[in-house]
Amino acid sequence: MPRKLWEANSKTKSKSNLFDFEKFLARKFNYKPKKNYKKLFNWTIKNPKLFWTSVWEFSNIKGVKNDKFHFPKEIIKSKFLVNSKLNYAENLLSISDNTKAVTFISESGYREEISWKELNNNTLKLIKFFEDNKIKENDRIAAYTANQIETVESFIATSAIGAIWSSCSPDFGTQGVIE
C-alpha cells in the first residue's frame, strides 16, 4: 500500500464537514463518530440506503426525494434515490449573501470575484433573457466561451429553466472543439 502523504490532525478533522456528517449519522442511527474515513466508508457499504438518504437530508437538498433503490450484485449498476428530482440552480442559489461565490483567475493572472448575491442577481437576469427569447425546458444552449464567471452564470440560468447546457472552452483548440 502506498505511503500516506498527509493526514489531517484531530482538531482539523473535528472542524470538517465529514465529521459533521458523522455527528448527523450519530443523531439518527446507532453510529459512533470516530473521525475515521475507513470506518465511515465501511458503514456506507453496509448501509447504502441509510447513507444516500442521509446525504440528501444532511445536505439540505431541495427537491422531491424518492426512497427507491436498486442494488444488484454488480455494484456499478447500482441506483439510489431513483426518480428523485432536484434542480441544481435552485439548490446552488439558496445562498444569497455577500460572501464569495465564484473566483475566476485567468492564465494571465487577471482575477475576478462575485458574491452569492451578485451570482443570484446575474443569473436571474439571464433567466429573464432566456424566457423573453422563448428558451424553455429541454431546449439546448451551447457556448464557445472561456471558463469565466459569465459562463458559470449562464450554466446556472440554463439549469434553472430545465434547458440543456453544453460548452467548450477556446483553449481546447480548433480540433478539440470540432471533435
Tell what function each PLM region has.
Residues 27-31, 89-115:
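AMP-dependent adenylate-forming
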Residues 53-66, 82-103:
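A short N-terminal helical cap/helix-turn-helix that marks the beginning
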Residues 44, 93, 119, 123-126, ...:
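Adenylate-forming
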Residues 79, 129-172:
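Conserved AMP-binding/adenylate-forming
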Residues 1-25:
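Charged, compositionally biased N-terminal leader segments and the immediate start
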Residues 38, 45, 56-57:
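RNA-binding accessory domains that recognize and position tRNA/RNA substrates
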